[in-house]
């Protein structure tokens, strides 16, 4: 897992966390909003690693040491006091799941760390009953409890939850930084990196996903081959190529995004 200072972009969120650690002013509840792939999980996990680090108490630094038992457990995603809340149904987090995984366990002291940290990904999927269940914990948390609600849409939360959480929003990473990262870390060509940076609109997770996807690469090549030579090829050839899109029916949004990006580049 990445250290906080290794995460690309979102400097304001990283500085917020560093300042909170430096001044020992950790909130009990955070809402982190951003698109899928924008780094919410990485940021929450890196902050959790700093909070649980045993070596930090010795060094006095505001970053994790990477060597203590807590840091090693975080690296292996098995720290007993960092709980990722799961849900069975894909589109809803139920009141039962919130009660079982948070409400009924939060009063149990941390096993070893100074904090007991709960991370709820896709938290916008909590139904009203689940939100009301977690609200009491947010309102009256144990001193050691920290809750992260990661979401693509803060508007899905009750006003009472919004008013009691620190609100943080991820931001797009500059295109040049994304390109540099992809070339250096993912070993792709400058041309591929430039396309991925533009296509992802600064979403580093999305950019990484598309440069590593052979299916996306094939879809991109097919789409661009039509767009680049549409004025030269016959109508029956276009029809044949369109038939090839059947195997990409689950990536129709990507097709339209490639299409729009092509015309955006032409116009601007």
What name fits each language-model region?
Residues 132-149:
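Conserved catalytic/switch belt of AAA+ P-loop NTPases
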Residues 1-50, 58, 73, 143-145, ...:
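Charged, glycine-rich active-site and insertion segments that engage polyanionic ligands
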Residues 2-129:
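Clamp-loader machinery-focused feature within the broader ASCE/P-loop NTPase space
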Residues 122, 149-154:
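A short beta-strand-to-loop transition that corresponds to the Sensor-1 phosphate-sensing loop
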């Amino acid at each position: 897992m990445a250290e906080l200072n290794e995460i690309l972009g979102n400097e304001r969120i990283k500085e917020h966390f560093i300042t909170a650690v430096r001044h020992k002013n950790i909130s009990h509840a955070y809402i982190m909003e951003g698109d899928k792939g924008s780094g919410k999980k990485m940021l929450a996990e890196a902050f959790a690693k700093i909070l649980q680090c045993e070596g930090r108490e010795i060094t006095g630094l505001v970053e994790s040491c990477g060597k203590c038992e807590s840091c090693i457990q975080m690296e292996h995603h098995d720290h007993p006091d960092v709980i990722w809340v799961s849900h069975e149904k894909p589109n809803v987090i139920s009141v039962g799941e919130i009660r079982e995984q948070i409400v009924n366990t939060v009063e149990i002291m941390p096993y070893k760390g100074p904090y007991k940290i709960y991370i709820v990904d896709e938290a916008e999927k909590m139904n009203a009953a689940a939100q009301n269940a977690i609200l009491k914990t947010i309102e009256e948390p144990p001193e050691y409890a920290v809750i992260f609600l990661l979401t693509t849409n803060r508007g899905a939360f009750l006003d009472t939850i919004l008013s009691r959480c620190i609100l943080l929003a991820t931001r797009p990473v500059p295109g040049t930084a994304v390109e540099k990262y992809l070339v250096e870390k993912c070993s792709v060509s400058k041309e591929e990196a430039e396309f991925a940076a533009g296509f992802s609109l600064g979403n580093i997770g999305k950019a990484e996903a598309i440069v590593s996807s052979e299916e996306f690469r094939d879809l991109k090549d097919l789409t661009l081959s039509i767009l680049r030579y549409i004025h030269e090829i016959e109508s029956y050839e276009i029809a044949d190529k369109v038939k090839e899109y059947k195997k990409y029916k689950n990536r129709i949004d990507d097709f339209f995004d490639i299409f729009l990006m092509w015309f955006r580049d032409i116009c601007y």
